[in-house]
């Protein structure tokens, strides 16, 4: 007999609004995942760590097997949830670039990768949570709050996603990144466009005088 399909909570930390491109990608994901028992969670908070913790609590009340965190400034393929589930890992996701130059890739791969490759999976020391699937059993091994900010030895702030990764690895969990999927998702940003110089004004004036 086939095992039942997992129950999945999709948690989206956000403010009062989300990007239109994200909303479209989210709708397409839900359509592609309609055979699953889904719970859609919008956790509004100006404190992202609190939003993630609230999402975990709501997922637990739903009886979810997994929680998928999606940030509201991401775009992704419709099949992303099924593809992450097929990896059968406790913590697996995709990474992406920062939205400001020099557009560094977020997360830290382990220096020593497994001797037996796992397809497109790369084992990570840390991974961002903008597109991350987590087994609910992970939270049974962690004390609350599951997500929180911290500081390093030099006083720099460590984000709630990296602190979670550190604690999960200390609890014995491995963290994986789907390298192929990471090339398919996008981090929505914003640019300001300006005229290159003021010369166009003089050119326009001369054109009017002719």
Where are these regions (language model features)?
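Short beta-strand-to-loop acidic/aromatic patch adjacent to the donor-nucleotide binding site
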Residues: 64-75
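Active-site nucleotide-sugar/metal-binding loop of Leloir-type enzymes
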Residues: 53-66
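N-proximal low-complexity "stem/linker" segments adjacent to membrane-targeting elements
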Residues: 1-46, 50
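Conserved catalytic core of nucleotide-sugar-dependent glycosyltransferases
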Residues: 56, 77-151
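C-terminal catalytic/acceptor-binding lobe
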Residues: 3-9, 141-210
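Residue-level recognition of beta-strand->loop/alpha-helix junctions
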Residues: 41-44, 95, 179
């Amino acid at each position: 007999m086939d095992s039942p399909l997992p129950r999945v909570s999709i948690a989206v930390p956000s403010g009062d609004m989300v990007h239109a491109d994200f909303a479209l990608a989210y709708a397409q994901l839900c359509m592609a995942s309609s055979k699953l028992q889904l719970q859609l969670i919008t956790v509004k908070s100006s404190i992202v760590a609190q939003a993630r913790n609230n999402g975990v609590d709501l997922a637990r009340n739903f009886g979810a097997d997994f929680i998928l965190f999606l940030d509201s400034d991401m775009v992704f393929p419709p099949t992303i949830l099924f593809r992450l589930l097929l990896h059968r890992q406790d913590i697996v996701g995709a990474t992406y670039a920062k939205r400001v130059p020099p557009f560094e890739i977020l997360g830290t791969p382990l220096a020593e990768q497994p001797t037996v490759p796992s397809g497109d999976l790369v084992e990570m020391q840390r991974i961002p949570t903008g597109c991350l699937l987590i087994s609910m059993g992970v939270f049974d091994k962690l004390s609350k709050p599951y997500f929180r900010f911290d500081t390093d030895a030099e006083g720099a702030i460590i984000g709630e996603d990296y602190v979670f990764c550190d604690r999960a690895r200390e609890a014995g969990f491995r963290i994986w990144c789907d390298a192929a999927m990471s090339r398919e998702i996008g981090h929505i940003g914003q640019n300001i466009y300006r005229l290159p110089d003021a010369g166009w004004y003089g050119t326009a004036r001369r054109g009017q005088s002719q």
